[in-house]
């Protein structure tokens, strides 16, 4: 093919231009501005002229996605202000501007789903900030879980809290961590649905079922998956901050996934910042959080994991406190009271209030003496008062508990159970209460022995997150004013001295106030029997006098407690 020469526009007439254009078109050449480029090989005809222009004007060339070379005379908006570019693309794709501002790059590559493409089947979970539904994806036919995040308005604090879960989930990718599959948004309202894989069970629902009894190898299988998921979270700089049974989901294949990252946060151990201590459900809350620490790390998740391990082996929660004072008391009696150095180096806002008068001796090995011997060192480490002594998730996976026989079974080898979640246990208990109330209304005043088993044990409810305390208090006041509401009524934590109460949407089988104040569980061979020859024995449950739902003391002694009303609880 012959050479193509450039020409000066000033010396070329209109007729000559037309003639040149027609001749070049027939020879496969296209004119672009002042340059001619061949279609076949993209050779630039007037390179010399371009170089002169570049020297004169200082313009720079950039290569486009099509391979052409063009001059750029304006700053690239993508490079000068990438956040504006992303926001524009996201809004054009259908994302609400308030969500784009809050989540930034986390939305890149996604397209918002519409609510009418899902069909709700059943409500499967409820919390302080969200409801979870079983739903069908009408586009794929797949069963999914929809988590509806509730927030009253588009205040920056509310939106930031909601967006944090999305940002955290986009950081994580592990078989034992729930995966965010999509988002359902609305341009007209402050509603947002998070789309997850549907899971048939949660650990709290299975553990509370009277027909479920985990063997040692099954406990190892579940705990190995839990700690593996935590190891991944911590390696990605994520603290979960609410590890408990109802947040550990299990599918039909026995795979456990850590879920509900609503209280999770991103942390950097090399650049620490103050964080709220009002996290983690009370029964699984580490002592440093109860004492008001704002400088903490992975140890709070490992403490919760230790509580879960002991609970699976014992068949019930090991420290079911009702208030922060009582929870600390139970921790001191089981794990021992902190040393003097602990109080000196720790910056605790409540240290002076909750410091015990007399030191407590650590009694984990004595209390859990009937547990499998290989489990005791791991429980002892995870339930250390000093956060540093809890080590790491990686160290826990290398402990004797996982490297000794019987080894952990494979997830697929776990028994198959009918779908069971914490909310199912709550519904069963509510139905039992309704039947009791109906019998009482019909004049059935005869006292009946109440059969109590693991399905009727109390489950803790999460306390409010301090970062959204104003919104939570507002919901509580509205609930209290609505006489027709079926929700539990309770005072804000900062008004009741940190009492656990019964938060909105809490799942529990019986009111924790029915548990006598001085009750301390005893973990004997009846709690966990790992003999190969004998079947597991029945779990012991409390059958003593019931406490009054308000005063928390025995009904028989109700009249004698008026003089002690209002006295402050003190850790002895």
From Swiss-Prot:
| Keyword Calcium set for record | no
Q: Where is the composition biased (Low complexity)?
A: 9-40
* Positions with a binding annotation for ATP: 124-132, 147
Q: From which domain of life does this come?
A: Eukaryota
Which InterPro entries does this entry report, sorted A to Z?
CDK (IPR050108), Kinase-like_dom_sf (IPR011009), Prot_kinase_dom (IPR000719), Protein_kinase_ATP_BS (IPR017441), Ser/Thr_kinase_AS (IPR008271)
Question: Where along the chain is composition biased (Basic and acidic residues)?
Answer: 47-67, 419-434
- Indicate the segments forming the Protein kinase domain, all copies: 118-402
Residue ranges with Polar residues bias: 74-83
Give the Enzyme Commission number: 2.7.11.1
Active site residues according to the UniProt entry: 242
State one molecular function term (GO).
Answer: protein serine kinase activity
The entry's keywords: ATP-binding, Kinase, Nucleotide-binding, Serine/threonine-protein kinase, Transferase
Q: Which SMART domains match?
A: S_TKc
Region spans: Disordered: 1-89, 409-474, 526-572
Catalytic reactions on record:
L-seryl-[protein] + ATP = O-phospho-L-seryl-[protein] + ADP + H(+); L-threonyl-[protein] + ATP = O-phospho-L-threonyl-[protein] + ADP + H(+)
Q: SUPFAM superfamilies, from UniProt?
A: Protein kinase-like (PK-like)
**Compositional bias (Basic residues) at which positions?**
554-572
Q: Does the keyword Repressor apply?
A: no
The entry's family comment says:
Belongs to the protein kinase superfamily. Ser/Thr protein kinase family.
Can you name this protein? Probable serine/threonine-protein kinase At1g54610
């Amino acid at each position: 093919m012959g050479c193509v020469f450039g020409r000066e526009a000033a010396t070329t007439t209109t007729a000559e231009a037309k003639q040149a254009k027609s001749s070049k078109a027939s020879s496969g050449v296209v004119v672009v501005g002042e340059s001619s480029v061949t279609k076949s090989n993209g050779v630039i005809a007037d390179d010399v002229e371009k170089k002169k222009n570049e020297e004169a004007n200082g313009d720079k060339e950039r290569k486009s996605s099509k391979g052409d070379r063009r001059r750029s005379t304006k700053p690239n908006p993508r490079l000068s202000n990438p956040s504006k570019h992303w926001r524009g693309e996201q809004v054009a794709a259908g994302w609400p501007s308030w969500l784009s501002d809050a989540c930034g790059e986390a939305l890149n590559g996604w397209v918002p789903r519409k609510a009418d493409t899902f069909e709700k089947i059943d409500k499967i979970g409820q919390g302080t900030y969200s409801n979870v539904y079983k739903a069908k994806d009408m586009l794929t036919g797949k069963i999914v879980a929809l988590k509806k995040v509730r927030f009253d308005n588009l205040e920056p604090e509310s939106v930031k809290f909601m967006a944090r879960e999305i940002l955290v989930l986009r950081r994580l990718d592990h078989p034992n961590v729930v995966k965010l599959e999509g988002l359902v948004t609305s341009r007209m309202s402050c509603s947002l649905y998070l789309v997850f894989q549907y899971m048939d069970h949660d650990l709290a629902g299975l553990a509370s079922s009277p027909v479920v009894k985990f063997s040692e190898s099954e406990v190892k299988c579940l705990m190995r998956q839990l700690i593996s998921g935590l190891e991944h979270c911590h390696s990605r700089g994520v603290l979960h901050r609410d590890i408990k049974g109802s947040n550990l989901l299990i599918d039909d294949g026995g795979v456990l996934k850590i879920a509900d990252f609503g209280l999770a946060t991103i942390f950097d151990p090399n650049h620490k910042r103050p964080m709220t201590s009002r996290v983690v459900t009370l029964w699984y809350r580490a002592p440093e959080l109860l004492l008001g620490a704002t400088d903490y790390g992975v140890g709070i998740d490992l403490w919760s994991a230790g509580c879960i391990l002991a609970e699976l082996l014992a068949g019930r929660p090991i420290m079911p406190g009702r208030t922060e004072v009582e929870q600390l008391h139970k921790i001191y009696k089981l794990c021992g009271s902190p040393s003097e150095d602990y109080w000196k180096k720790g910056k605790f806002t409540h240290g002076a209030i909750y410091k015990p008068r007399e030191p407590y001796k650590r009694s984990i090995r004595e209390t859990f003496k009937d547990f499998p011997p290989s489990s005791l060192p791991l429980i002892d480490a995870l339930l250390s008062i000093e956060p540093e002594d809890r080590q790491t998730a990686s160290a826990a996976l290398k402990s004797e508990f996982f490297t000794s026989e019987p080894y952990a079974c494979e997830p697929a080898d776990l028994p198959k159970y009918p779908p069971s979640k914490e909310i199912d246990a709550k519904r069963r208990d509510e139905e039992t209460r309704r039947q009791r109330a109906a019998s009482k209304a019909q004049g059935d005043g005869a006292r009946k022995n109440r059969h109590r088993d693991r399905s009727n044990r109390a489950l803790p409810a999460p306390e409010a997150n301090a970062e959204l305390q104003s919104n939570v208090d507002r919901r509580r006041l509205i609930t209290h004013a609505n006489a027709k509401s079926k929700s539990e009524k309770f005072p804000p934590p900062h008004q009741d001295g940190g009492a656990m109460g019964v938060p909105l949407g809490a799942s529990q089988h019986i009111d924790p106030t029915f548990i006598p104040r001085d009750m301390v569980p005893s973990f004997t061979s009846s709690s966990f029997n790992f003999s190969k020859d004998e079947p597991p024995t029945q779990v012991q449950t409390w059958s003593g006098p019931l406490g009054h739902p308000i005063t928390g003391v025995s009904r028989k002694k109700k009249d004698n407690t008026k003089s002690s009303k209002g006295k402050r609880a003190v850790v002895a």
